[in-house]
Amino acid sequence: NDVVYESGLAAGSAAAGNGEFAYGTFTVSDADGLDDIDSVTINGTTTAIGSLVGSTFSGASGTLTVTSYDSVTGIAEYTYELTKATTDVDLVTETDVFTLMANDGTADSAQAKITIEITDDIPNAVDDTNSIAEGTASVTGNVLTNDLHANTQPGADTPTSFVSWASTSATYGTFTNTGSGGYKYELDNKNADVQGLDDGETLEETFTYTMKDADGDEDTATLKITITGTNDVPGLTVDPDAGGGGEGAHDRQECP
């Protein structure tokens, strides 16, 4: 079988290549000589042998074009172009099949087939990062935004969608799933570990998520949130009565 790749489609992971094309040949014959061949039928469409070159035939997922025909040998060359992504089914090989018959004006030949095997494209979940400074209330984001292949394409089977978070349990704050890959992280600024951070010191929270493409292929990545310590304002307490108060003792005063 000829093989094409969904990754070669416009949104595919290798869109700059030519993976969506396949090339091959088929041969017509007649015991009485090739001059007797009148027409060829491909996928139910009959074309006169003299008009075969340049003819295009539609398949389930792409098109087959006859690019040459040698009337001496009976060999025809074709190009197949995958034009859309398929719906992938587990344990099933996706194919586009073309049936062919030759006719000499009185009878059809036995049926032959051209089978194009279609290789599925996959999504690419990319690790995410976000940051929040001590004293800040919250940060938000969406982990699907950067889930692209190296060529900045999402993969042929679009749209991609969010599946789930492995866990939303947080150590230094509260993590909320806001839907469709979105999240909100609220920092607990009263947490002892957060308050204990020196200026520039960090803590990290990591969350794992799963996304999928339109035909169900899944991929997993992580979101890492970095908490950065800031310089806390010092406090000062004045207590005039600390040494034993008498008349004229002043009220206790505190400076932030």
Question: Where are the predicted features?
Answer:
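Acidic/polar, solvent-exposed loop/turn segments
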Residues: 1-256
